[in-house]
Amino acid sequence: MLDERIYESYIGILKEEMVPAMGCTEPIALAYGAARAREVLGKEPEHITAKCSGNIIKNVRCVIIPNSGGLTGIEAGVVLGAVAGNASLNMEVLSNVNEFERKRCRELLDKKICKVELLDSPVVLHFIIEMQAGDDTVSLEIKYDHINVTKIVKNQEVLLDSDHKSGETPAAADRTLLNLEDIKTFADTVEIDDVKEIIENQIRSNMAIAHEGMTGKYGLGIDRIIRETYSNDMLTKMRSLTAAASEARMGGCDMPVVINSGSGNQGIACSVPLIVYAREMELPDYVLYRALVFSNLLTVYQKQYIGKLSAFCGAVSASCAAGAGITYMGGGELSVIKKTIENTLANIPGIICDGAKISCAAKIAASLDAAFLAHHLAMNGQSYAPYTGILKEEAGETISCVGQIGKEGMKETDKEILRIMLERV
């Protein structure tokens, strides 16, 4: 059995990370910040400046904002949040936008009331919303996490100043306690009632948007191409449904997703493949619940090293966790699960992140292909030897090394990606 402190921390991590969000999380974060700033200002702004870190710019430029009528971009997310956002709904801030508010948003965008500036900051998730109406001004800063407001200033008066020097959002749950052994033990032994509501919400929400993606017209429709091109096997079903959910989300669908590590695509990628597998294999609900607990915690564990935003695509981490979760459901011992992780990371330790957009679905499909191959290799007793490339003696060490590459080694790559993306702007 796990120590009570670890058990409660793991429950806390799941509650903090697995929350519903509507739309891609970075534009939603901007909308939330703008909605909060508008509340403080107390009136519709006449001028707005959005100062955004490079990773925020990268992840907002190309993705369709939900309930916007097809709008994309930082200005649209900020102005819609200011006009129609309900900050009390957190990551579902834009869930109640009406047609009048959409029209007003377009009018203000036509007037170009919002300008965007690059914020030179070492914090990858960092932006400041500045608003002005008449003689009143407001500045609101969000850092480290999508709705973590660290500073509010109105008319030169500081209303809030709670910057967290650790570089992490303060949380009740201690993420430093995460490790593969304890994650496996926790998944094996957790009281189902302690996680049932969170897990069932993830199953319900993420599968609903997956089916919406299959029937609606979003992106390139790669789910259909996958189904028509490949045999109707388990992998095809997993890849097509997961890609469909991602395309719907990136394509502006207003249905909520239960996210992981601040990302809807990661929440989708670490859950939908397991749900498909469990249903195809007719496994009991409790087996799926425990596997989803394992997969979600493994995703968080990997992202602790990489960071919420980086030059690495988070779909790889989540797909790696999905592959390991399938091994878990298939009865694989911890040693076999570790082989699945190592096999995945030996194949695709990282795909570059060039922003949130509809092609994220293709990256998820490719990552799941690698993860499912890794699963089958591991279940057949095959794995790459330690020190094959970046692999270490233990899977946990390899995860740490991949995180180090993504967080530190790829900093200059991230800057170059942003430079290339902004060339035509």
Predicted ranges, named:
Residues 2, 21-25, 55-59, 63-66, ...:
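A structural signal for small-residue-enriched, beta-sheet-centric alpha/beta enzyme cores
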Residues 37-40, 66, 277-290, 300-366, ...:
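Hydrophobic alpha-helical bundle architecture
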Residues 109-252, 418-425:
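Signature of multi-pass transmembrane helix bundles
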